[in-house]
């Protein structure tokens, strides 16, 4: 039943993304009712071409959605790597909805407007912690901004602090957990996770809905192209070759290779999924700092000339200048004049 509901919803999303073309096809059909001869057959052929295109696209996107769900389910550890704005959190949120096809145990470390998604922190995965439990069998764990929790650029230092997470990382598949971690660079992900990850997901491009007055009904979908790799080494090789082709002025190839476990495909993400999370939910951290500041006076640059040199130096807070321009203590004379 879940698969049928998922298929039907996906069908509606995909059909909705092509609604404008469907209206054009309907218009052609209405016109053809009043035409005869060559014009009728031309319109008939155009309708047939549209129908074949619509059917192929619908099947194409349906298979891609099912393929992504199965890929995540088959890999206990996956990482999503992409620069700022490529849609990493959007993809996690999309999976928070589509993975319900296989399980009801969904956890995330960032807020989602979904009553079925549970809160998770890094302590849930720490075996030295005795306050929060490890998620049960068949759980999907969505972990955004992993760099905020573990500094992947300092693996040796982090290993001392986060050694309690290693048992979970190694035994995730035995626990029936499926986890996804995001980062802007592969080097930002902790080495213990990166090397054991059997799923590498790369958001390559993201076509956002264009918000225009009167056309919002036709622009309620994101189209994301992603690449999936089964090993970090395969991804690094592909990335190196892509950089070389770009440097030579050539187009980067997004060609799937089933033998190497490399696939590229597109998925449609409804705008309603994107509205389930706040991309700036961590802005409360700013308030933690600002609430402790007593003097919150701000200056305009036009007011700087009214300050003394010493006040300017204190205001700009340039440590090197403050250190070197600090008045030296005068040495006292050894004997009276």
Curated annotation (Swiss-Prot):
Parts of the chain that traverse the membrane: 4-24, 26-46
Gene3D superfamilies, A to Z: P-loop containing nucleotide triphosphate hydrolases
Localization annotation: Host membrane
Keyword DNA damage: no
Species annotation: Spiroplasma virus SpV1-R8A2 B
Family of this protein: Belongs to the plectrovirus ORF2 family.
Keywords for this protein: Host membrane, Membrane, Transmembrane, Transmembrane helix
Membrane topology: Multi-pass membrane protein
Primary subcellular site in the record, as a coarse category: host cell
Superkingdom of source: Viruses
UniProt keyword Endoplasmic reticulum present: no
InterPro entries on file: P-loop_NTPase
The name this protein goes by in its record: Uncharacterized protein ORF2
One GO cellular component term: host cell membrane
